[in-house]
Amino acid sequence: MGDGSSSRSNSSNSTSEKPEWLQQYNLVGKIGEGTYGLVFLARTKTPPKRPIAIKKFKQSKDGDGVSPTAIREIMLLREISHENVVKLVNVHINFADMSLYLAFDYAEYDLYEIIRHHRDKVGHSLNTYTVKSLLWQLLNGLNYLHSNWIIHRDLKPSNILVMGDAEEHGIVKIADFGLARIYQAPLKPLSDNGVVVTIWYRAPELLLGSKHYTSAVDMWAVGCIFAELLTLKPLFQGAEAKSSQNPFQLDQLDKIFKILGHPTMDKWPTLVNLPHWQNDVQHIQAHKYDSVGLHNVVHLNQKSPAYDLLSKMLEYDPLKRITASQALEHEYFRMDPLPGRNAFVASQPMEKNVNYPTRPVDTNTDFEGTTSINPPQAVAAGNVAGNMAGAHGMGSRSMPRPMVAHNMQRMQQSQGMMAYNFPAQAGLNPSVPLQQQRGMAQPHQQQQLRRKDPGMGMSGYAPPNKSRRL
């Protein structure tokens, strides 16, 4: 297919050659690629011609159709709706090869690139208002997920998006639900799903082989992200032994222990039950660490509210680790500067907004992901989704909404989703409504959804007997 130019030109001469769904969009180019597949930037042809991120999944490893990971992501995203969670706009199937495309609202930025820009280009840290606003919105979205019994299981800076357009400028969106799971009374240990969470953000109970874990693993990851926003570098940069499927990662634990100190039975009573602590093949129990102290690494006063919140997120014992709901009520968010809905407005009258770079876009490709021969180019802000340094004065800054779970209603099933039997492909009974299979609350019950697992910090609270399945 060459560089994709000729095939794209031919298809543009005859739109009838394109699938009907594809004719809804004007392709801008490829903006990402990973183990899951490709991500494209497109614009809707109908006004207001908004930017859309289209995620194309690779075929399943067995070559027999749509990836189960993609199906699980769809099944979750179609059920949730919240300002701080990425919005699934549509699902498209190319029946010629059964390739799957998910369409999302496009986010111009992510925390990984924002942090890197400050570290490598700007040369100074993010201001307190921006850090606080980004963190509050992340916790707000996570609280919604946990209230609906969903663990994300892969929180990291690159999966935390930030909108760049005018209407939602500076709003955080949690993305990438490929590893997310329903977690109330699982039918089997979650450890059966294999290794989860990128290693630098992986909770110690996972590293030590816990078979049953809770939403507390997400809160550990948020703590790591919080520290990274403060220091512009990952807090625990362990080297992963990728050749092994064993969850135990000695170097990562070593990095954690050197900063937080050695865990003890007094602080973490259930530590003795974790397989890799119990077996102690690597003799980690006897190893002594001279902790440098978390406060010294993140440069925070130990009596400051910011340090108090961070230390509670990085609590060893998952039963004692702060929850998203509790974190939203923390003193840190009640002090000036208060967090806002737009994380990127200036925190001081004379302060300049940071001009973050737009995403590089490979414009020499098509929706099949044909390899380009030219390097990707950054598309001008006016042609994509807006520039960070636009006219966003102090008047655009707004206070966060009340700290409750917002927009609990679920997304309506679109026609694009109706075209494929997702429940059957996901191993669910298509004749039974999804809400019944998952134990999802009916509309009149939705406000009663609350986390009641041990990760809530409610020690001694027995999980409900109702099953939640995916």
Swiss-Prot record:
GO BP terms in the entry: cell division
Keywords recorded for this protein, A-Z: ATP-binding, Cell cycle, Cell division, Kinase, Nucleotide-binding, Nucleus, Phosphoprotein, Serine/threonine-protein kinase, Transferase
Source taxonomy: Eukaryota, Viridiplantae, Streptophyta, Embryophyta, Tracheophyta
Catalytic residues in the record: D154 (proton acceptor)
Domain Protein kinase: 25-333
Tissues with expression: Expressed in roots, leaves and stems. Expressed in young dividing tissue, such as shoot and root tips, lateral root primordia, young leaves and flowers. Expressed in the inflorescence meristem, inflorescence stem and young flowers.
Subcellular location field: Nucleus
Residues that, per the record, bind ATP: I31, G32, E33, G34, T35, Y36, G37, L38, V39, K55
Species, as recorded: Arabidopsis thaliana
Protein name per its UniProtKB record: Cyclin-dependent kinase E-1
Complex formation: Interacts with MED14, HDA19 and LUG. Interacts with KIN10.
Region (Disordered): 428-470
GO cellular component: nucleus
Catalytic activity: L-seryl-[protein] + ATP = O-phospho-L-seryl-[protein] + ADP + H(+); L-threonyl-[protein] + ATP = O-phospho-L-threonyl-[protein] + ADP + H(+); [DNA-directed RNA polymerase] + ATP = phospho-[DNA-directed RNA polymerase] + ADP + H(+)
